[in-house]
Amino acid sequence: MAFLPNGQLATNVTFQTQHVSRAKRGQVLGQRGGFRGCTVWFTGLSGAGKTTISFALEEYLVSQGIPTYSLDGDNVRHGLNKNLGFTQEDREENIRRISEVAKLFADGGIVCLTSFISPFKRDRDLARSLHEQAGLPFFECFVDTPLDVCEQRDVKGLYKKARAGQIKGFTGIDQQYESPDAPEIQLYAGNKSIDECVQEVVSLLQKNGVVPESAVNIVKELFVPESGLEHAKAEIVDLPTMEITKLDTQWVQVLSEGWATPLTGFMREREYLQSQHFGCLLDGGVTNQSIPIVLPVHTADKDRLEGSSAFALSYEGKRIAILRTPEFYEHRKEERCSRQFGTSNAGQPYVKMIMESGDWLVGGDLEVLERITWNDGLDEYRLTPNELRAKFRALNADAVFAFQLRNPVHNGHALLMTDTRRRLTERGYKKPVLLLHPLGGWTKDDDVPLAWRMKQHQAILDEKVLDPDYTVMAIFPSPMMYAGPTEVQWHAKARMSTGANFYIVGRDPAGMPHPETKQDLYNATHGAKVLTMAPGLTQLEIVPFRVAAYNKTKSAMDFYDPERHDEFMFISGTKMRGMARAGETPPNGFMAPSAWKIMVEYYKTKAQQS
């Protein structure tokens, strides 16, 4: 039945069954496929955080390719329910209408988020029953924030007016709020961050099959838990052992700290093929994984270990990890290199290491006994994704922008980073924080070593070319592969695990010259373009690298303007290194003086060692 304008009920209304099924609708809605329609009903006092959490959850789920829409109480009263007041009858009708609309969104395959005080239990029960009758999931989410905290927030000044008697029937003051008896989830938003609340709801949706595991923003560390450590230490002594290289150990560190979440260890063949052919992991949703993380094995080790349910990995004689349920498969080196690098020329240094490695690969679940350390004076900078998340929370960062680098920082880089922060502030972010994240794994011989780079970066911070109060400097443990646009996706994906939501990409990222022709292996613009299209990276906003050059008029690095070409001088990396080797001084404003001094000192030391 339906109401007519004269107040009579329409009796000639028949419910029509649609031709398109939910399963079929789910195939074309969103990026992940599958029907995910449901309603998450946020309820709680005014100022509890319902809308804030709902909007943040909507932003997160959409970034993961999951169609989501947030219905907010104030917004709905501007349109659909603008003819309703705040009497008990009008409040009931307000919630009834919203319940029906939410059900339609959910039936359309959308995750519908509703944020309404909805103080009465019977109204919330009605919303639930409407969904249950339609066979749609309904999750009641009680945002349980104490009244005193809500009053302290009082952004709209409503509590103050209610206390003064200017608003009658205000929930929590002179009208009772009926707390849910058994909500699917209870969020204590008074003492938890918005991000923590969002992830609790995401975990609930994942457990109920609405959200795939790959969309849960949890870092999967592969360390043996404290409770099982003694048993693992006793077990590893009796296991067959395989000695691994320093490069392999760096990949153990990457995996164990959760940079490659959701991988549970070195790739088995199924994961390897997905990475090689699709640039993604596809089980449980789409996760970008453009580079294979694999463990090469020589034939003698394969023959010795095949059939074992587990074996130990040892580096420099120390057993560091257990590989369980191993799977051996052929290492097709030329094909791997051709797909990953666009060349199988052994003059490319990482290709050379692959070609010299074992003829087999082994995948399996990794259990790492303790954190990988290198005792080189830099371990304090090797922060895990979880540690970086904690650091950003402590800084109250509301945006994190990451800058990947393997070279010394000059003032052109610094200009880009400070300009990015300025633009984020203009967009409304209160405290954007820079993750200055130099790559700390293997690099080719002619790159500046990590220890010298870290000293140079610290000098940049000490001279306040970059603001140290809004910068976190840490080491990214991955080896460098020089695989261009393929590798830059890995660099971006790994930073997502830290909570970074912006990523600065430069010209020719992860590029190098062809070992024979000396021409660039990759188009210098393709890395930035690929990142804007890559599957599984929609959570990350890409900040393209604007060209910076030395402005002779300003005696400073500046964004290049082709209309003022004669004012600019380009100082390439090759030219910069040549000047440092010769002990020359660059133009004033090109690099912080103390940072340049470190560059000169490095090349002087290198020359003496040679």
UniProtKB/Swiss-Prot annotation:
In adults expressed in coelomocytes, body wall and gut. It catalyses: sulfate + ATP + H(+) = adenosine 5'-phosphosulfate + diphosphate; adenosine 5'-phosphosulfate + ATP = 3'-phosphoadenylyl sulfate + ADP + H(+). A motif (PP-motif) lies at residues 506-510. GO terms for biological process: 3'-phosphoadenosine 5'-phosphosulfate biosynthetic process; sulfate assimilation. The active site is at S118. It holds the Pfam family PUA_2. Pathway: Sulfur metabolism; sulfate assimilation. In the N-terminal section; belongs to the APS kinase family. PANTHER family: BIFUNCTIONAL 3'-PHOSPHOADENOSINE 5'-PHOSPHOSULFATE SYNTHASE (PTHR11055), PAPS SYNTHETASE, ISOFORM D (PTHR11055:SF1). Bifunctional enzyme with both ATP sulfurylase and adenosine 5'-phosphosulfate (APS) kinase activity, which mediates two steps in the sulfate activation pathway. The first step is the transfer of a sulfate group to ATP to yield APS, and the second step is the transfer of a phosphate group from ATP to APS yielding 3'-phosphoadenylylsulfate (PAPS: activated sulfate donor used by sulfotransferase). This is Bifunctional 3'-phosphoadenosine 5'-phosphosulfate synthase.
